[in-house]
Amino acid sequence: MKLQSGSAPRSALAVLAAVLLTAILPAPAGAVAHRADGKVTDWRGDATMLSGQTRISRGELIHDDWLYDDYGANLDGGPNTPAFRAALAPTRGDYRYPTNANRYGHNAADLRQLRVAADGAGLHVVAFLQTLKDRDAPIVTLAIDSGRSRDEGSWPSGEGLDTPAADHFVTFSGSAATVTDSRGRRARLRRPGVNMAENAIEVDVPWTSLPATRGRTVTMYVVTGLLDPATQGYRQVPAGGPTAAAPGGGASGSTGVFDVGFDPDEVFSRAIGSHWGEERQSAALAQRDVSELGHTFDLSHLEAGVTDDYAPAPGRFYDRIFRSAQDHGEGIELKNPTGSNAGGSPEPQFLSPHQPYGLYLPEDYVPGTPTPLLLNGHSLDVNHNEYQAVSPNLYNQLGDERSSIVFTPLARGMDTWYIDAGFVDVMEAWEDVKRHYSTDEDRTHITGYSMGGYMTYRIGLLMPDRFATATPYVGPPAYQLWLPPGDPQPPGDYQVAGHTNNIVYNGLNLPFEINNGGVDELVPATGAQAQAQTFRDLGNPHLFYFYPSADHFALIFADEWGHTRDWMERYPSRNLEPTEVRYKRYPSMDLPQHGMHFDGAYWVDGMVVRSPGDECAPGDSACQEANGSVEALTFAHGRARSSVQQVQFAYPGPPFPADVRGTDRVPGGPVSATNGFDARLTNLEAIALDVASMGIDPAQELYATLTVSDGGGPFTLTLRGDFPAVTATLDGQPVPVRQTAEGIELDLVLAAQHLLVVTPQ
């Protein structure tokens, strides 16, 4: 390390003694030794994984930043369309990355997490970037202020910031690191450690480079930008659009900073349309002043290995971050919003492993107490912060007033339609919520607006046993457009696989509240009305609120969700053991590449469609159309089949008057319980039933009527349960029985209607 003139000299003996002492002293209890070697496994503190939040854990200061918030200064005072597809989710910042995606990935200066530790040798710092395609694309500055500096002036490495004053500035890229004091004296530090797999850059800062800092209360600030190879400082952001080598959107004298950390109080101004957690940041950068975006703490807590008692506050909105198991690369895919994918496409847009989702904890949330959960899908061209930015009253009425957690996945993009990568992201975010918060799986509901309404149909009808209610708002029944009696548009592999009208059959035990407007310019009323008619024809429990005067955006801007709150309270819990189950299986709707097969619900699963099989080649329309179905009734509950009751009334509002029609499912009356079931099968060659959930006693003789409507053929029936040794007959003729660890398997040949009897030996 070399110091410029004016620094305090130290003897070689003193330096050697300090190094030896540091080497032989153990780290304090709770602390972990660190070294900037690129091996990030020595960073072991527990992060909040909540954007903007900071804590100390095991002697590490850990700050989690907002993801995809790296848009620099708001110089023009208004929202701006991002470089990527996001027509309804503008940024406040104006900066845009160089178009060389192989180097910058449209996301190169996005700080994901900062960690700082301390020991007898000095400070240890690691910055995790959301995207790191090139180790020398980003540059990071950590400013440290103990309140001693009285020097004003610009930050030292081209950041373009004037305040706050700080004692020291630690600036580093993937290849070099320096520390500069408030008087401009600069020392070169050891080469940073880089871990490209973890997008991490580490740097060690000895106390000798930070005089009179150790053990003090300090305020830290962290900013990021793009490295200028010529100056080894911040690349300036010129006016105009970006080029392959240079960013754009700046102005003469504007800051070179794209992202700022330590912002726990980010706002989402409804009138402005801020969706990315960078409104305060972008305003501060326009003023070249980040003095309000810092974190003050006692450095001695790091050396002492302190762990604080951080817990998220209830009654507020967060962006939570989780690490996906999916490998899509890193960076942002721009996804051209014109041409063949004008309505969107299933390919992921946000590629990096760490993904955010919106999370609201209700005012009365108590960790450890099972809490209702609401999955709330976002619209096309908007993100996971949509409801915080546009309709925050949703969190009051569907969160606080129901004591419910609400979460909104990003779904890997603004236009993925929850079909492939977006569907998987929902499931991963859902698992993260359940893993870290106290949720009640029996009181889980699903809703969403526009494309999120489509998600409500799709996920709700593929997995109806996961939810208590489903409430699509202005959701198209099909991926992307349906004008009946015509086919959904555009044509292609999702014309069948993306059409939820095909699986309304599955909603027998999932009450739907459907909401659509009569003058909707994006989701035509004809498709919504046809979807509701299918619910009526099948007798599914539902209400269809039809608002004659409402356009596509009227309901979300009105921000009134009272009747949906009441709907969820009317059906607070799912019924996992219904008397009747209906399920239609489309193999083309599976996601075999992700290990996801939708082959039943409740006490039915293992459905195998007779032909053409369980996986479809692209363009194989016959395979896309193939489906099989079951309608089953257990006699063991002692109830007859349910009946349908029509519902119709005029709803006065709020927010607008609506014509409401629907059907209630009236439970069947009591009958003598018998140990058996009835199953009506179409185009299936196998099915499995869970007899315990059906109320059937496997130790007693079991009777079943099996009816096929497609000509029949070989059929495998699996009955899951604790069966003793049994024999079986079909229409009085013996059939072979295979005893398995799960229960019994019966190989049958079905033609019309049959009587199956299973008898314990």
How should these model regions be labeled?
Residues 370-436:
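Active-site machinery of serine-nucleophile hydrolases
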Residues 480-481, 485-569:
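The feature captures the conserved acid-bearing segment of alpha/beta-hydrolase catalytic domains
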Residues 363-369, 416-451, 461-467, 506:
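Gly/Ser-rich "nucleophile elbow"/oxyanion-hole loop immediately N-terminal to the catalytic nucleophile
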Residues 32-176, 225-233:
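Surface-exposed, glycine/proline- and aromatic-rich loop segments on solvent-exposed faces
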Residues 259-356, 360-361, 537-542, 548-761:
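Alpha/beta-hydrolase-fold serine-hydrolase catalytic core, especially in secreted/extracellular enzymes
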